[in-house]
Amino acid sequence: MNTPFQPLQKWFANNAGVMQGAAAPLLVVAILSMMVLPLPPLLLDMFFTVNIAVALMVMMVAAYMIRPLDFAAFPSVLLLTTLMRLSLNVASTRVVLLEGHTGPGAAGAVIEAFGHFLIGGNFAVGLIVFSILVVINFVVVTKGAERIAEVSARFTLDAMPGKQMAVDADLNAGLIDEKEAKRRRAEVGEEAEFFGSMDGASKFVRGDAVAGILILLITIFGGFAIGMLQHDLSASQAANTYILLAVGDALVAQIPGLLISVAAAMVV
């Protein structure tokens, strides 16, 4: 029985490979478009929730994998999650600066919850908590993971010729067949490529931590200026409104960033 959707189903079936190949570029374009397009608070809430859920899933996968090549796509995942966090930071900063004077719920329920529930509505406490999280993420986890990735890449590349010679020796001795030798050579190459990629990808995590600090400072000073000059708010009103929203926004981005940093440290 023919249905109105049958031609569409055939088109999807015939172009499945093309669509799979285009999925990653389209995802990158969609993430980067969040930096440019204004997002309503409801969409921000959804994207922040997805961001936290993805960070948790990545950390759980990193915790339970047996060897690094089990998660060979991790450098790409690291790039995409970093881009998503930065895009959400830019989008939420835009909403905070444009609509912050209307009240604490201007940037959505998630930022409001982080600003009121986690730090008790006190922006000074929020700044202290954010500073502690930045120290943990930037100084402890990220710096250690970056050094581990650098050393792992160096030692893996140095050991690569020896591993390939060992495979050739086992093949010549008859301990393995040609098929197993090809598999082992491919595994050695993939391992070297993975650790080399992780050495570069760890810089994304470090840069993301620095960007979080700068975005928070820009949002605070920009919010003060907009609140006092454009909306005639007093200094205390501007502080209570914009700093609370800025700190809530920073915490929403910093917690997934910390989870991804821990995952990167586990992988390498």
Residue ranges and their predicted role:
Residues 1-34, 41:
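Generic start-of-chain signal for non-secretory N-termini
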Residues 47, 85, 148, 201, ...:
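Residue-level signature of catalytic and energy-coupling elements of molecular machines
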Residues 21-28, 36-52, 72-82, 116-143, ...:
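Hydrophobic alpha-helical transmembrane segments
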Residues 16-18, 60, 248-250:
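Short amphipathic alpha-helical surface micro-motifs
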Residues 2-13, 44, 59-80, 90-115, ...:
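Juxtamembrane helix-loop transition segments at the membrane interface in multi-pass membrane proteins
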Residues 29-31, 50-64:
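Central hydrophobic cores of alpha-helical transmembrane segments in multi-pass inner-membrane proteins
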